[in-house]
Amino acid sequence: MTKYERDPELVNFLSKVEDLNSKRYSNIPSSKPAGEALSPVRSHNSGEYRRADMMTGKNVEGCDNLAYRSAYNYEMTFSPKKTHYSLSELNLERITPRPDLEGSASQKEKKFLISEEDYLLLQKLKASQTYNDSNADKNLPSFEKGPRMPSRGRPRPREKEIITIQYDFELPGRADIPSSSSSSSPPPLPTRRDHIKITDGNEEKPLLPTRPNKAEVTESPSSRSIKPDAVVPERVKPAPPVSRSTKPASFLSSLEDNKLTKAKSYNSEMETPKTTVKSSHIDYLDSIQLKPTTLSPTMKNKPKPTPPSPPAKRIPRSESFIKSMLNSNLTTTSKPSLPEKPQKLRNANLAAHKTKPSIPPKKVELNIVLPELRPVETSPTKQNFENSIDLPKLRSSNRNIKKEEEDSIPEAIKGIQNLKKTKQQKPAIPQKKSFLTNNSKNTTLKNGDDINKLNDEIEALSLRNNLKKRPPTAPQRKISLPEALRKVELMKKSKTEPVLESSNELSINAKLDAIIASRNLRASNTLPELSGVNTNIATSDKYTTSRDETVKETKPLVHPNKNRTRGPRRKLPTRV
């Protein structure tokens, strides 16, 4: 525990407070003076009146009370908390016994009118009881009788009831104690010693046996059996078993008595009332007699362990029941005859009615000649599914034969056979060769070489096919006015320039290329001057360079995916 060091001034102040407190408690009168009854308003709001008196200068409480109050508040705020309190603080010493409890205890006492013999017997019992209680109290710790304290695990003392006990000397000394073996009677008990002897000259009355102080040594069963006083009753032999053959019983009655055939229901077991054994009060000596006499085992008296018997083989219930039924000599009795009905219950109409004798049926001989019938062809029960359906006759198809023929032909030849025959037309290009040049004529055609003709036609066809495969030309952009004027000037210059080479010097291939290019230009609606590079393949170097420069200058800025000029679209002014 930590010690709290206090200021010496505080200790001095608290000592003064304690002195004032002791004076105050010493001067308390035994009966408090009846003070003025406060009004309900004053009792509830006493703090407000006290503040008002303090403001006016009137001090209601004395200096001692104020000092005590301030010291108490200081102690509660700064001092360590107490873990326990004294009995005086809890007001446990001031509790007085209640008068109603005494009245209830007095009411519990019962009064009886008894004879003189019963009274003397009661006094003897009380004397023996007080002696036993005094011996028991010596061992127990002594408790000082003082003011009532809260019980700490000890039960409260019970209020004792005074009840007279009637004793009959003619009855046996001990009450029969219920035991497992009803036939065996317990041995006689020893007599008790008398603690208090009451002698009367007139008559001698028997005294009850007292409880011995020392525990008696239990005797061995062999020595006890030798005594002539203790008579051991002979064991009753069980009745001899009766043979089953002597008892005439039917098969049904044997089944009813059998344990296997008896139906055990849950309700029947629950409804059987259980016999409750009333436990009577057993005395100390009786409990000693009931205990088994166990002596410390010695080497001589120690019994030899018996060898365990082999477990009996369990026979199933069904087999044992069947064997017992086969071994039993049961005679089946005939069905008992029904008793006759009494005359009062008989019906007069039924008795008068006579039963008619049964007439045997007549045997009639029928001489009927049956005609001969044709043998019937029995159809099989299981009909075939194919015969039951009537399928129409169809024409035989040559599909399989054609398939076999097609499989023999190779795949390449199949494709050629499936192609449609086209009419061979002469190409239009050699027919228009005469229109290529106005002044000059081709020398190769005059000679009439057929081989050169065929070669030229094949080349022209290949050129035409290549042109078809080319991607479509992008649309031209819209040309502005200054560009258009510039193009017109260039076109005029190109027309005025003289042709350097004659058309005679051009080859047939160049002429064919020129014709195909002119057709493409007409189809696309383009200017003829733009494709001047293709037409003049065999021209001089000066002419080709001049044409390239003109094409580069006149080439418009065309985007392949757009049809308008570059830049955003111009919007008309909305606010004019």
Swiss-Prot record:
| Keyword Magnesium on entry | no
| One GO-annotated biological process of the protein | protein localization to actin cortical patch
UniProt entry keywords in alphabetical sequence: Actin-binding, Cell membrane, Cytoplasm, Cytoskeleton, Membrane, Phosphoprotein
Q: How does it assemble?
A: Interacts (via C-terminus) with the CAP1-CAP2 F-actin capping protein complex. Interacts with INP52 (via SAC domain); the interaction is direct. Interacts with INP53 (via SAC domain); the interaction is direct. Interacts with RVS167. Interacts with SLA1.
Q: What does it do? A: Recruits the capping protein complex to actin patches and the actomyosin contractile ring, and/or stabilizes their interaction. May serve as an adapter to link INP52 and INP53 to the cortical actin cytoskeleton. Binds F-actin.
**Protein name per its UniProtKB record:** F-actin capping regulator BSP1
The molecular function terms in GO held by this entry are: actin filament binding; protein-macromolecule adaptor activity
Q: Report the locations given in the UniProt record.
A: Cytoplasm, Cytoskeleton, Actin patch; Cytoplasm, Cytoskeleton; Cell membrane
Add the further remark from the entry. Present with 704 molecules/cell in log phase SD medium.
Provide the species name: Saccharomyces cerevisiae (strain ATCC 204508 / S288c) (Baker's yeast)
Instruction: Tell me the gene name.
Output: BSP1
Biased segments, Pro residues type: 304-313
Q: How is it modified after translation?
A: Phosphorylated by CDC28.
Locate the region Interaction with F-actin.
Answer: 408-470
Composition bias of kind Basic and acidic residues appears in 191-206, 544-556
